[in-house]
């Protein structure tokens, strides 16, 4: 090894090349592709300087290590890129999130593909694929990158269809579909990936979100107001005692249905804040006006009853707070209003006329 080569080695060039080799030998995960592309871009920028500085026979070890590293980087990057589609397909066998939230693989893959199509990585990945194809004596086709990314996203679509069918609860399945379709529409609109998939694809996901949202409401919260029927109570036709019994019965049925629905859905998650707030507001608009009106009109019938708190179980304000606290991600639940039914009960002895006035 010549004098200059020794100085270069002592300066850390060999250690740098060895470090790059170590990265190529580590586990081949999708996120590693970006690191390999960064390494390739750095080596490519230094190529002319490397050739000028280390082109002599004395630097043969550095030359060999550099060529080996470049080959490892290109082979590794290409291998990971072509493996992404396979990995997405394999994820189809995994169960969907129990809380109906967006699977991490969906959000990570869409974000990942957006980066690959972006101005920072697309030219580098294209160059890597061109070189890799030439080594295999294959002609590089211009659309190979976008076609593969499109295929990956369509595989994600198929995963969503499969995961939806894995839920045993229709409303949870619909909530999951709402989450995923809204994520694909909202997060990809105006992005490189969204442009690739096209406006019709984006619009389709927006429409699917609306469709499953309608089913979600129809199969869950829209069923609650029917328990507060006014039939037979308009003129207290059966007498005050009969009317009171009927009101108590209907309030009890409403409370049981509400408690069960709230208990079940309080563990579900809508990660996107705008969708969560809109969903909660729609639930409030579906349930609260009917409950408020019913309590204003018929609350006084049970106010003198010793067990009134069993029937007039919630204040309107308490009910609203509970509904608005639904679907929070786990990390946001702590320190916020939990909305437990026990926390919104009217204590024994509280004048129910205050409840009636509070709903005005």
Residue ranges: model-predicted function:
Residues 1-360:
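Long alpha-helical rod scaffolds of large eukaryotic non-enzymatic complex subunits
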